[in-house]
């Protein structure tokens, strides 16, 4: 049913009918009736009257000019008189009441959600409010918009506070009054948005006790009993909010407090694991501990000695007699003899010789032959060690078995004397983060200290430098230890020469290094069986017809320059003068030893076209397979 009336301004000289006056009767609040919030909403049939929008009793002007509140008994016998103003006085007074009510909710913490039923009629005027003037409706709209936009809150926070105020506001109502009605006062000002179904489901799932079903927007609901404002019945808002926040913080702090204990329990370090590791690396760790102990002890003793001591007083073999050729150098190192180069380079000794001195300290061991200075070198090292360190070393040696004692023959302690800031004369290869796990000597520089001393050779495993063990270190850490050895005036390097018999016993990861060193040793021994010949090739625009491999600084270390493969259709293929694997000694009168592959290729390209004389070294069929393994 449509209750729309004429929206023209009310004429003060026209008599107001009783039915319109009954709409503003105060019985609306006494009989718990409510004006519908929507324009076409159905009226409450139980009460038979409609509630005023602001909940205040209407007032009309009497003959004396005073406003009088209408009562049901007096509604039929009201004295009418001519008005003194274009607008009735009761309208102005009711508007003042609306303004007073509008100022009250601003004192609450959440003004946008206060449960006042009054402002609903401002946005959606009913039949009685459409008879008012357009100017008064604009004022009411301004007040409504001011109240609405004055409270700017986020939707999610508003939904949380909405559920809290619903729980406090509806606790005083009977259960039966929730049926078929809407949430009172939630949409009172009209500008506040209605609850979406998703938000209502969130309120229901959050466990709020006041979250009720979604109301039908077309059905009205009775307000609470009494004329007191609904905000007076609300308990303080922060209390339930603090409860929700406390529960959320407890839930969030629960797993955070458990994190340290879980982390501590997830990484245990048991004794069984450490014992297994010790059992697996027992032999290797003993060798490393002995070498590191000797290295650190000698290094400490050297640092304590005055710098004026010259090491030329140590008896030794001159450099010229000690290393006439590379083969004699390797043989002397394998036999355990210590070699020194002169007064300023240093000396070296075998750990097996040091063991003999530790077993018989009181007995003076004399050298049988005069061609080596190992007893003097061993005695000098013994003199560097303190009594406590010497006792520890004796205990370590006594606990070793025969197999481990034999491995001491390949371990050498080299002491180098140098200037501050000078390098040791060799580079390192390998590391725990690389394919070759063992730290080895990659290259010995020709004019460096290690080359002058003669003990440290390419392919030797480096156990420690200046008392710092290199076992299990990465490549960068090993290089850092090598750079730190530049500062002192002395350097103590413990190296081990790998052999095919001892390499698998020490560590399985040294197999590759042992095979490479063994192949290089065999290639040195098989030099006597190799044949050196001179061939002549035709140099054309495409080169000599073969490619090179090896050279200084190659991927496999410093290797001799050899022929890799022969190109098809070349003159060298047809003549069969050269073969893959032949080592190039001289090319057009230029020695090729010590050159890189790039330098050798530049020499070949610079040659003029024509015949070129090449001196090659070809190994016999018996020893040809072994050096190929070393080159691979």
From Swiss-Prot:
Interleukin-16 stimulates a migratory response in CD4+ lymphocytes, monocytes, and eosinophils. Primes CD4+ T-cells for IL-2 and IL-15 responsiveness. Also induces T-lymphocyte expression of interleukin 2 receptor. Ligand for CD4. Signal peptide: none annotated. Residues 184-197, 321-338, 508-520 have a biased composition (Low complexity). Pfam families: PDZ. This is Pro-interleukin-16. SUPFAM superfamilies: PDZ domain-like. It comes from the Eukaryota. Residues 30-270, 320-347, 497-520 are annotated as: Disordered. Homotetramer. Pro-interleukin-16 interacts (via PDZ 2 domain) with PPP1R12A, PPP1R12B and PPP1R12C. Pro-interleukin-16 interacts with GRIN2A. Pro-interleukin-16 interacts with GABPB1. Pro-interleukin-16 interacts (via PDZ 3 domain) with HDAC3. GO terms for cellular component: cytoplasm; extracellular space; nucleus. Residues 412-497, 534-619 form the PDZ domain. The modification Phosphoserine is found at residue 222. Residues 139-153, 199-209 have a biased composition (Polar residues). GO terms for molecular function: CD4 receptor binding; cytokine activity. InterPro entries: IL-16 (IPR020450), IL-16-like (IPR055287), PDZ (IPR001478), PDZ_sf (IPR036034). PANTHER family: PRO-INTERLEUKIN-16. Keywords: Chemotaxis, Cytokine, Cytoplasm, Nucleus, Phosphoprotein, Repeat, Secreted, Transcription, Transcription regulation. One of its GO terms (biological process) is induction of positive chemotaxis. Residues 406-502 are annotated as: Interaction with PPP1R12A, PPP1R12B and PPP1R12C.
